[in-house]
Regions:
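General structural concept
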Residues: 3-146, 387, 396
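Eukaryotic beta-rich interaction modules
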Residues: 15-23, 32-39, 246-252, 273-282, ...
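Contiguous beta-strand segments within globular domains
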Residues: 28-41, 258-274
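Short amphipathic, basic-aromatic surface patches that mediate peripheral association
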Residues: 41-46, 118-122, 272-288, 305
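A cross-kingdom feature marking solvent-exposed beta-strand/loop segments within repeated
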Residues: 91-97, 122-123, 144-151, 176, ...
């Protein structure tokens, strides 16, 4: 199916024959290594003694930072070629007479291939402010666009983009009164470049465990405790040593790698284990219920934009699991801990919260983690648990770095070999994070 990307122009127009993912109002998408097939057409009648028609693949990543300070304004810009050295033009018609009769037209088919990898294009003077995106070679970045404005704080406006297009150019030469004159017309066909992760959707989300310790001080931890006296309430408020204490470790096992357009279920495990040595002896061998009231998972994206010696970081958050999700289940989610007087505590039972909440990477309009010379996108995954033990509230939370992979390559693509799926890592091999909590209440 053909799709026209520029307004039809009798002087010159482009028609791409093989775009994928066509939808109204959206540019077509290609992937690195793919060949773009199309046709350049001219319908303006006439004859010239010499003409030349070429097409060239273009890619550029640009950044612009504008800063207002009172009545003054500073602008900083940068632009890099995303496709290594300038791509060699494909010559479709060269240095020959061109005659187009009235009511007809002339077409030239073309095929240009998007590079699978590109090389460093920084000049020596640019290496001070702009870092290399990858190793000696790296994939071209996917299409990207962002705009940020913070008038009420720094008066800063930031724009960044990664853009690709095919450009056609026709040069018409003729001699007038002994002087060779040249008329030039161009046409552009923009498209989106979509990076892919070779193979089927991932099943290994790099699960890791975060372990956080919390203490509850309450008389209600003792079975059969009735209404509290005024003195007990006072001692509990000030958490005196006479108030029974339960100390437990909350284990949260969750992904450190996510993938766009991968709707496979993602596990999130919760478990709790007692810390007997820090628990009041009177409640040893007494099971305690930890009721999980809410769980929130948020993906925080940061975009770094560099323009000359100036840089800007903008942040935005996307809710993957809202804090109302557990309440919407209509049933209680709980964990049980029981400090043992003697012997080792039993292996704590796990709750697969991801399965309960049907957690999947649905479409959130996300970009994968990426870095170019002047633009980069990184992610942090923040979680928060709210719970109760014998009516006493607590809140725990943590933030860790996460990587968002591009979507999987299409299975029906003959150019891609499907590797065997990797099994999910077993819990006993998960890494333990002993870092202090971001907050605890």
């Amino acid at each position: 199916m053909a799709f026209r990307y520029n307004t039809p122009d009798p002087e010159l127009s482009i028609k791409l024959e093989n775009p994928r993912h066509l939808s109204s109002g959206h540019l077509p998408r290609y992937i690195p290594g793919e060949t773009i097939i199309g046709v350049v057409r001219r319908t303006t009648p006439g004859a010239v003694p010499e003409a030349r028609v070429v097409v060239t693949l273009h890619g550029k990543c640009t950044s612009k930072i504008k800063i207002k300070r009172g009545n003054s304004e500073s602008r900083y810009e940068s632009s890099f070629n995303c496709l290594s050295a300038p791509m060699e033009p494909e010559i479709l018609f060269s240095n020959a007479p061109l005659h187009i009769p009235q009511g007809e037209g002339m077409s030239w088919p073309f095929a240009v291939t998007i590079p699978s990898v590109v090389e460093d294009v920084r000049r020596a003077d640019q290496r001070k402010h702009y870092t290399l995106p990858g190793g000696s070679t790296f994939p071209p970045p996917g299409s990207f666009a962002m705009y940020s404005e913070s008038i009420w704080t720094t008066g800063e406006q930031v724009r960044a983009s990664v853009e690709y297009y095919v450009q056609a150019r026709i040069e018409l030469s003729h001699v007038h009164r002994g002087i060779t004159k040249k008329a030039i017309h161009t046409a552009k066909a923009p498209f989106q470049l979509r990076n892919v992760n070779i193979g089927p959707p991932i099943t290994d989300f790099r699960l890791k465990r975060h372990q956080m310790t919390h203490m509850i001080a309450a008389y209600k931890l003792v079975p059969g405790m009735g209404d509290l006296t005024f003195g007990q309430k006072t001692r509990q408020t000030f958490m005196t040593t006479s108030v029974p204490r339960l100390t437990f470790k909350l284990n949260v096992i969750l992904p450190h790698t996510l993938q766009i357009e991968n709707e496979s279920p993602i596990p999130i495990y919760l478990s709790a284990e007692p810390v007997t040595g820090s628990t009041t002896e009177i409640i040893h061998d007494v099971p305690q219920t930890i009721v999980i009231k809410s769980f929130m998972l948020r993906l925080k994206q940061q975009t770094l934009v560099q323009a000359e010696k100036h840089s800007s970081v903008t942040s935005e958050a996307v809710n993957l699991i809202p804090n109302t999700a557990i309440g919407a289940l209509g049933r209680e989610v709980s964990l049980t801990v029981m400090p043992r007087t003697s012997g080792q505590s039993e292996e704590p039972a796990r709750v697969n919260l991801g399965e309960m909440l049907d957690f999947r990477m649905r479409k959130h309009g996300l970009q994968p983690t990426f870095k170019t010379y002047n633009v980069g996108r990184t992610y942090n995954l923040a979680w928060e648990v709210e719970g109760r033990v014998v009516g006493e509230k607590f809140k725990l939370g943590y933030t860790h770095q996460a990587k968002v992979l591009p979507g999987p390559s299409p299975y029906n693509e003959p150019d891609f070999e499907r590797p065997a799926p990797r099994p999910e890592a077993l819990p006993e091999y998960l890494e333990l994070s002993e870092a202090p909590p971001a907050y605890s209440a």
